[in-house]
């Protein structure tokens, strides 16, 4: 509905392509993305669902299969962050980020893999972050969740390779998206100074 997810959806939008777009809260953004994808000729089905909920994932995929058939490409992009000292986090805040960031990946992979294995074909792309490799101060849970995605992706890639299913993760650096909109001008400039290109990446890139 925004950011990297929206850019990926539009990049995949072309005549006869069938897209299933999911967002939990941003219904306006979801509708906007769907309309842009349709303008490019794609067939689009949208769902408002919490992908950290296994039963919600099961329901939306059942409906998607009924409309479009089995999933060929799964992009796991759901993600939230929590900024602050680890010692100030509550267990519920920690669990919520983990549920969305890694729980959603496991839910959707678990539900689409059987069909992919049966058809001996499938592609899975998990959206990760450089913080999953190096960690980020005051983003302990976000870093942990992305590190989990990286390890899960490597393990699943080995497990599914004999079934002709490719599993990869993209560990983005700093990208100009709504998730980073909270940065002050000074913080954004300091972040840009640490990037060789001297700026954040764009979602289109």
Describe each model-derived feature in a short phrase.
Residues 1-2:
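Conserved glycine-rich cofactor-binding loop
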Residues 109, 145, 153:
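Active-site helix of classical SDR
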Residues 129:
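Residue(s) in the substrate-gating loop at a strand-loop-helix junction
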Residues 114, 158-162:
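Alpha-helical segment proximal to the catalytic Tyr-Lys
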Residues 86-87, 134-140, 162-163, 198:
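Active-site loop immediately N-terminal to the catalytic Tyr-X3-Lys motif
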Residues 85-86, 93-95, 180, 187, ...:
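Substrate-binding pocket helix/loop in short-chain dehydrogenase/reductase
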Residues 15-31:
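Conserved glycine-rich Rossmann-like NAD(P)H-binding loop of the short-chain dehydrogenase/reductase
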């Amino acid at each position: 509905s925004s950011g990297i997810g929206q850019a990926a959806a539009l990049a995949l939008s072309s005549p006869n392509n069938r897209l299933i777009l999911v967002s939990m809260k941003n219904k306006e953004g979801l509708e906007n993305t769907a309309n842009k994808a349709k303008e490019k000729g794609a067939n689009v089905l949208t769902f408002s669902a919490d992908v950290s909920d296994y039963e919600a994932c099961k329901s939306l995929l059942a409906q998607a299969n009924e409309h479009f058939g089995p999933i060929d490409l799964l992009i796991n992009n759901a993600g939230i962050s929590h900024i602050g000292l680890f010692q100030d986090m509550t267990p519920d805040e920690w669990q919520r980020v983990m549920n969305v960031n890694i729980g959603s990946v496991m839910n959707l992979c678990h539900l689409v893999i059987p069909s992919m294995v049966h058809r001996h074909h499938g592609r899975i792309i998990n959206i990760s972050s450089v913080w999953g490799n190096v960690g980020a101060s005051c983003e302990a849970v976000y870093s942990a969740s992305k590190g989990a995605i990286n390890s899960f992706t490597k393990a699943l890639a080995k497990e599914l390779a004999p079934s002709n299913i490719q599993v990869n993760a993209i560990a983005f650096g700093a990208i100009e998206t709504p998730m980073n909109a909270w940065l002050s001008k000074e913080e954004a400039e300091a972040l840009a100074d640490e990037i060789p290109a001297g700026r954040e990446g764009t979602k289109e890139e």
